[in-house]
C-alpha cells in the first residue's frame, strides 16, 4: 500500500537541514545519511549523499529521475555472488 497523498512525502527533519547547509556552502561534499526511508525531494537534485547500507556509505548523486523514490533504493544492502555453477556441466 502506498502512502496517503494528504500526508505528503516522508523526509527526516535533519536531512532537510543538512541539504540546505550544503547548498548554501556551495561545496560538493558527500552528505552522510542513515535515513534510507526518506523520500528524495526536488531540493536534493545535484547533491551527493552517502547512504548507509549497514556496512559503509555508498555515494548517490541525486538526479531528476530519482525524485519521489526512497534513498534506500539506490544503496543495496545485500551482495550477490552469482548462482552456483552446475558441476556436471563443468566436467563436459
From Swiss-Prot:
PROSITE patterns in alphabetical order: RIBOSOMAL_S19
UniProt keywords, alphabetically: Ribonucleoprotein, Ribosomal protein, RNA-binding, rRNA-binding
GO biological process: ribosomal small subunit assembly; translation
InterPro entries reported for this sequence: Ribosomal_uS19, Ribosomal_uS19_bac-type, Ribosomal_uS19_CS, Ribosomal_uS19_SF
Pfam families in the cross-refs: Ribosomal_S19
Alphabetical list of HAMAP family matching this protein: Ribosomal_uS19
UniProt function note: Protein S19 forms a complex with S13 that binds strongly to the 16S ribosomal RNA.
Protein family according to the UniProt entry: Belongs to the universal ribosomal protein uS19 family.
Protein name as it appears in the record: Small ribosomal subunit protein uS19
Organism: Rhodospirillum centenum (strain ATCC 51521 / SW)
Lineage: Bacteria, Pseudomonadati, Pseudomonadota, Alphaproteobacteria, Rhodospirillales
Gene responsible for this protein: rpsS
